[in-house]
Amino acid sequence: MRTDLFDFHLPPENIALRPASPREAARMLVVQGDGVLRDRIVADLPDWLEPGDQLVVNDTKVIAAQLSGRRVSRETEAKIEATLIKRLDGSRWQALVRPAKKLAPGDTIRFGHEGKVCLLGHLDATVEAKGEEGEVTLSFVFHGPALDQAIADLGRPPLPPYIAGKRPADEQDAADYQTMFAAKEGAVAAPTAGLHFTPALEQRLRARGVGLQRVTLHVGAGTFLPVKVEDTEGHRMHAEWGSLSAETAAALNEARAKGGRIVAVGTTSMRLLESAALPDGTIAPFEAETSIFITPGYRFRAVDILMTNFHLPRSTLFMLVSAFAGLETMQAAYAHAIRSGYRFYSYGDACLLFRQPDERIVEP
């Protein structure tokens, strides 16, 4: 499918640089596929759900994956910025660095901003391998929990490029760029639909009879990568590690058998649920990497409703929502959102999408 079909123009003023306050005051565009677009706010979410429905949230926790350092292995030093994108083992990470041209295999980087050190001393890493587009393999001097603590001491929240390009990260982002469900460290980008939730909203959802289930998908930096090919068939999707427990699978299957709907909070929860779903729609336990790439024509097995933010043009995530609710429907919804001043991307507003009626699997 041609990728230019998923392109649109977004005025810069529609890009949110800070989240709404309180979080549930963010706007929410309800898209049911009946041709009517309804402007609401996130606090209204319980009104659109029924007793027995199950919300599925991602409990991944964003690590302080943005590191500043200096190349110290040559006569002249060079400033280096690194974003950790994937843990390889106890002491090695895959990272994106800039300027990549100043690094070669064997170089040593000493991390710490303006002379700052962690409790254990300097955090040094050796460039073990170098790939394309600034990608390197870093081997750190620390291992396991000691390395985790050093990264936490020295790192900063890895804000998306469309925010970081307009302002530096600050202490407020450490709280803002983390969901209330965050529990399991490993993400280098937030599952942003979850940012809209507050304890008060969760309480109202439970009072409505809506269940809440947790899954884990460690969001990688690949979520921000553009689709550079002209046809979706040529795009290679990034892999992310996810986990869905047997208990959660059983709860979701039981709820669906009783007529409840599965509501994915975010595209990360959606991708994990669809990865775990069997051909008949049964959700199975899952613990592995997934590189599922959802485009129009995909037959959804697990998810009935999707709550998500507004995504980048020509991105895999806009392709996903177009597959779920229909390309023409989403083109109209996004045009309405832009005209109406909705705020886009990670800190922006939400939309609540109902699956195209002919897409739900009828179980035997």
UniProtKB/Swiss-Prot annotation:
Molecular functions (GO terms): S-adenosylmethionine:tRNA ribosyltransferase-isomerase activity
Entry's localization field: Cytoplasm
Pathway: tRNA modification; tRNA-queuosine biosynthesis
Catalytically driven reaction(s): 7-aminomethyl-7-carbaguanosine(34) in tRNA + S-adenosyl-L-methionine = epoxyqueuosine(34) in tRNA + adenine + L-methionine + 2 H(+)
Annotated InterPro entries: QueA (IPR003699), QueA_dom1 (IPR042118), QueA_dom2 (IPR042119), QueA_sf (IPR036100)
Pfam family, one: Queuosine_synth
Disulfide bonds: none
EC number(s) given by UniProt: 2.4.99.17
GO term, biological process aspect, one: tRNA wobble guanine modification
Primary localization: cytoplasm
UniProt keyword list: Cytoplasm, Queuosine biosynthesis, S-adenosyl-L-methionine, Transferase
One GO cellular component term noted in the UniProt record for this chain: cytoplasm
Keyword DNA damage among record annotations: no
NCBIfam families cross-referenced by the UniProt entry: PRK00147.1, queA
Family, per entry: Belongs to the QueA family.
Purpose: Transfers and isomerizes the ribose moiety from AdoMet to the 7-aminomethyl group of 7-deazaguanine (preQ1-tRNA) to give epoxyqueuosine (oQ-tRNA).
Quaternary context: Monomer.
HAMAP family assigned: QueA
PANTHER family given in the database record: S-ADENOSYLMETHIONINE:TRNA RIBOSYLTRANSFERASE-ISOMERASE (PTHR30307:SF0)
This protein's name: S-adenosylmethionine:tRNA ribosyltransferase-isomerase
Lineage: Bacteria, Pseudomonadati, Pseudomonadota, Alphaproteobacteria, Hyphomicrobiales
